[in-house]
Amino acid sequence: MNLIDVKNLLFKYKMYSGEKEEVIEHTAIDNISLSIKKGDFVGILGHNGSGKSTLAKQLAALLKPSGGIIYVGGMDTAKEEQILDIRKTAGLVFQNPDNQLIGNIVEEDVAFGPENMGIPAEEIEMRITKALASTGMTAYREASPGALSGGQKQKIAISGV
């Protein structure tokens, strides 16, 4: 079973023109299909505006497809009742991690997601320890995110998802 299956994905942004209040559609993704197995390393390359971030948002169920289908862990991203479970499975780290770091210290940032999912405090503590160890950031647990380098901030953002 694939971890991610994308079949004939289509996504159109709706834009509204100012004066005429006319709806204009812009196709960001047109007929993309791919499969990713657990453990695969995948890179998505393309020019600015080619749909890379839009695809990532689709995989994390932050946007609904205009057409086609996406399965993440066997769950359909278009089904409202499965979105929370998909978001527990797939996370997104933005290009500029400053936009998603909100805690006063690193461990608060790493704990933010699990706290919002209602995970018990003891489990959150274990997850923080494991996530920071896996990204090599254990020594920065009590540090202010503002004092970290850009690469360190990205590692903290990854630890948080």
Question: Where are the predicted features?
Answer:
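Short helical segment in ABC ATPase nucleotide-binding domains corresponding to the A-loop/adjacent helical element
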Residues: 98, 104-115, 125, 129
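Helix-to-loop junction immediately C-terminal to a conserved catalytic motif
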Residues: 60
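Conserved ABC transporter NBD signature motif
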Residues: 68-78, 86
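The feature captures the beta-strand-to-loop junction immediately N-terminal to the Walker
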Residues: 45-47
